[in-house]
Amino acid sequence: MTGHTFDMRQANCSVSAAGALRGLHFAQLPPSQAKYVTCVTGSVFDVVVDIRVGSPTYGHWDSVLLDDVDRRSVYLSEGLAHAFLALQDDSMVMYLCSAPYAPQREHTVTATDPAIGIEWPLPAEQLVLSERDAAAPSLAEARAAGLLPTWADSQAFVESLRRR
C-alpha cells in the first residue's frame, strides 16, 4: 500500500553477475522516482537507505533478500536511495518506476559509505562496482553538495500525489 496511485512510467531489467553491487541510486525530488523491485531469477541482497535530510530515520538502511524462491518484492517511495548486491550469477532484477530515467536528475551515494554502515553479505574485496558507483560521493559529500532531498519536500510531494 503506497498511500497514492503508483503510475508506472518505465520498466527496467538488470542482469548481474555474483558480486555486482549496484547503487546507491536516487533521483532528484520532485518528481524523484518511486520503484517496485523484484528479483525474477537468482538472488539479490536489496537495500533501501533514507537519504531525506531532516527525516527521523535519515541515514538508516534496511534490507531484504529478493530471490526466485520466495518471490518477495519491495516498494521504495520517492526520496529514498536504492542498491542491490547480486548473490548469484545471472541474477535478474525487474523494477517498475514512477518516472522515466532522466540522467541529469539521477545521482549516487557510495554503497560502501562507513557512515551508513550497510552490512553487505560479501567481503569488500568481492564487491564489483561500476565506474560511476565506485566514484560516488559519500552521504555527507552528497548532502554538502545539495544533492539530497529533504524530509519536508518529500512529504509535500507524496501528499500532492495523494490529492490527485
Regions found by a protein language model. Give the residues of each.
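Non-catalytic, conserved peripheral segments adjacent to functional cores
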Residues: M1-R72, D90, A102-R164
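Ligand-binding loop in jelly-roll beta-barrel domains
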Residues: E78-C97
